A protein has these predicted regions:
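Intrinsically disordered, low-complexity, charge-dense segments enriched in Lys/Arg
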Residues: 103-176
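Short amphipathic beta-strand/extended segments with alternating polar/hydrophobic composition
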Residues: 39-45, 62-69, 123-138
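Short aromatic-glycine-(Arg/Gly/Cys) micro-motifs in beta-strand/loop hairpins
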Residues: 34-62, 176
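Surface-exposed beta-loop interaction hotspot
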Residues: 68-118, 122-125
């Protein structure tokens, strides 16, 4: 089973959310709980770019994130649903993508616009660039810690109570 199939299975199990469509031939996906006119998410693949949108009242706003690399896209989609899945299954939240800082030695690449805090992606300490156009710095910070792993492996860690072995360092600590 690949990442997309497993994620669809997990989303259906958790909330009855159906994932319909495909990226074949510039297609798209719809993430929907089956409630007509309810807010939902959509993803599409157009002109070499994967984009993820939040939709409300039958309208789709600007993309929450865009990338030309499917693996990066899969990780970003997982960051979008990861903590909600953990809460649904009664597991503690992870601080990854919430309050985690960008990985040491990595940088966020800005668009260069002084009017907005938009990013083009992240760059690793050894110079590898992972494109991800977004204004969500928390998404990029979390991405820096997981992008070198398989999205399927990271998904399975989100589904473990201890988040191990890859994500356990980001388990929320109980307040003292």
């Amino acid at each position: 089973m690949d990442f997309a199939e497993r994620l669809a299975e997990v989303l259906y199990d958790a909330w009855g959310m159906k994932v319909a469509g495909s990226f074949a031939a510039a297609g798209g996906l719809v993430f929907n709980a089956g409630v007509f006119a309810a807010p939902h998410e959509e993803a599409d693949y157009q002109e070499g770019k994967y984009s993820f949108y939040y939709c409300e009242r039958a309208s789709r706003g600007a993309p929450l994130f865009q990338t030309t690399i499917r693996r990066v896209f899969d990780h970003c989609v997982l960051q979008n649903y990861g903590n909600s899945l953990r809460i649904r299954y009664g597991f503690p939240k992870l601080t990854l993508g919430d309050s985690a800082s960008i990985r040491s030695g990595w940088t966020m690449v800005h668009t260069g616009s002084s009017l907005r805090h938009d990013y083009l992606g992240i760059r690793s300490g050894d110079g590898n660039f992972y494109p991800c156009e977004t204004c969500d710095f928390r998404l990029l910070a979390g991405l820096s810690h997981v992008v070198e792993y398989s999205p399927l492996d990271v998904l399975e860690c989100y589904l473990c109570p201890d988040a191990g072995p890859l994500l356990s360092q980001w388990l929320s600590k109980p307040a003292r």
